[in-house]
Every structure is written in structure tokens, then in C-alpha cells.
């Protein structure tokens, strides 16, 4: 299941769609409710990622979200009729229900140490 998002003001805890072996973090988001506070906001950010989200390269991260996480995520939303919800395959659609409106890469954080990534040694999240 989804880890959800906790925003306690000074700290936010949420997930990430992919983590590369080089340490890059990647999200795809519908409205930016997860990505915006990670980039700027709370003094502390805790990110949870299961081993299923670890990929070799940035291209692998994008492919993972497009082929696995995106279609599975939109399928959980009843009433969404995007191409990926219907077929299970991303069609880079133009639907108003599109969940991949924001694509965010994070290479580093400022100030250093503000973001903590906790890797979970099991399949966790989409």
C-alpha cells in the first residue's frame, strides 16, 4: 500500500516514486502535494522507499513510474478513466484526470542533511 503523507509543520514524511543508485530521487505527482513540501517547507523531510523503488539510472526511474507505479496508482482511484487506468499502459495522455502532471528530480538538498531517505528492505508502496 501507499505510505501516505504526514505533514507536521516542522517535518514531513512521505514516499518517493524512485531512488537511483546514484542517489537521485524522482516523483511524479498530480498536484504537487508531495513534491512541494519536499523541495521547500519543513525543516526536516523523511522519505520512505521500499527496495522495489531502487533503480539503476534516471531512465530506469522514469520507465518504472511510467510502466508500473503510474498505472497502478491511477487504478486505485475509482472513476478515473485515463488510458493507463483502462489499459494499464501509459499513453502520455492529455486527460484532466492525469496524475502525472508534475515530474520532479531531486539531486541534492539544501541545507545538507534536511532530507533523510529510509530504505525499507521489502516491497513497499507503488
Regions inferred by a protein language model and the residue ranges of each:
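Active-site cofactor/substrate anionic-group-binding motifs, chiefly glycine-
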Residues: 1
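Conserved phosphate- and dinucleotide-binding cores of soluble alpha/beta proteins
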Residues: 6-126
Amino acid at each position: 500500500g501507499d505510505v501516505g503523507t504526514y505533514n507536521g509543520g516542522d517535518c514531513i514524511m512521505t514516499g518517493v516514486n524512485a531512488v537511483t543508485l546514484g542517489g537521485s530521487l524522482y516523483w511524479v505527482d498530480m498536484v504537487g502535494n508531495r513534491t512541494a513540501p519536499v523541495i521547500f517547507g519543513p525543516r526536516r523531510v523523511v522519505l520512505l522507499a521500499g527496495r522495489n523503488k531502487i533503480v539503476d539510472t534516471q531512465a530506469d526511474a522514469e520507465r518504472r513510474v511510467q510502466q508500473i507505479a503510474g498505472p497502478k496508482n491511477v487504478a486505485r482511484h475509482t472513476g478515473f478513466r485515463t488510458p493507463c487506468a483502462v489499459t494499464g499502459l501509459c499513453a502520455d495522455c492529455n486527460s484532466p484526470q492525469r496524475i502525472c502532471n508534475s515530474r520532479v528530480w531531486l539531486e541534492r538538498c539544501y541545507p545538507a542533511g534536511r532530507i533523510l531517505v529510509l530504505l525499507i528492505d521489502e516491497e513497499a508502496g507503488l
